Amino acid sequence: MGVLALQGGVAEHEKVLRQLGAETRKVRRPEHLEGLDGIVLPGGESTTQSTLLRMEGLDGPLADAITAGLPAYGTCAGMILLATTVLDTREDAVRLGALDAVVRRNAFGRQIDSFEADLDFTGIDDPVHAVFIRAPQVTEVGPDVEVLARAPHGEIVAVRQGHVMATSFHPECQDGEVRVHELFLGLCADRA
């Protein structure tokens, strides 16, 4: 299982994936994409990640791999990178275009506005405790996008389109919360 390792919560995602029995590989260059069963795009700072993706020549190969069927799961900044349309970002920001959705950066406010909430999540029996840190929000979804979870006021915060999944929040930041990653690993197994 690959974890995009340019910036952000790489170690936290690796820890959860390993707890679930997955082998992990840090992805920093195009050749690191070879042979992966799936890839996690961690949270962090989306414009920084965008710049680094382009500098490493990874933006095109990553988009191509996901388009060709590589399962992908993006959290927070990863959701932003996966979306087809992003509001409140730089014009030159990388858009992998793998998720037919409109996403607004920092939709819930600044760092001081970070919050936690328990969410009903499609495919998971009990509520998921979600940590939102300068989180994006999905404002529109295409016809093939399934909404998996909403924030307490109805905002879309988790989605899936085929082999691509994304959350506004950080399940990797909640000790013992492995169920969202487990759902993604199931998606990867279904594609194998």
Regions found by a protein language model. Give the residues of each.
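General beta-strand structural signal in soluble alpha/beta enzymes
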Residues: 26, 74-75, 159
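Hydrophobic anchor at the start of a short beta-strand
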Residues: 23-25, 72, 164
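Cysteine-nucleophile active-site neighborhood
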Residues: 46-120
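Short glycine-aspartate micro-motif
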Residues: 3, 72-74, 130
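N-terminal beta1-alpha1 cap of cysteine-dependent amidohydrolase-like domains
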Residues: 1-55, 60-67, 122, 178-192
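Amide-donor transfer/coupling interface in amidating biosynthetic enzymes
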Residues: 105-192
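Cofactor-binding loop segments of dinucleotide-utilizing enzymes, especially the Rossmann-like FAD-
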Residues: 6, 77, 169
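Redox-cofactor binding/interface segments in oxidoreductases and associated redox assembly factors
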Residues: 41, 74, 167
